């Protein structure tokens, strides 16, 4: 399944300069299956019993993961904006008073994880669709680990789920989705630009932005406010 979304990365320079460059990011997701079982005697039955629930969780993880990448990209890498930000534009300051405030890649990954931890619940809907069919389902808390690479974002989610029906009980806990995204490439370019800005705080290297964008096949737009 292919989807396209637009991710826009914003950079605020000093008190009055806002540099924005927009990136079109293709998003394509696929879920990686996890093995499920309860006991040697019931492993086939339990696995078949849990398949629809497992597929449902993975579908929600895929959808929420795509939404996370778009939302984070449109808000400068943040799920929750830091104090040093522009409230009206809902964007963080990356460069302020000659100091770089660009978040680290680890912090970016944490922001994505926080999005999944808080938003996956809404897609799952407390498994109401299954409970109405007679399933007895209990779920624990969501805990996500995110890894951003050059062309991919991988979400690994721990979500304890117990599925019961009749005499069969099945447990699930591990789910993962890899989403094709150039978020890592975008971040690397922003980091390169911030390093340039720290070395030359009195000016903006417009030529650098253009050249680096072309080399990475990224479309850039710049605005001054």
Task: Tell where the protein language model's regions lie, with residue ranges.
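N-terminal leader/signal peptides at the extreme start of proteins
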Residues: 1-4
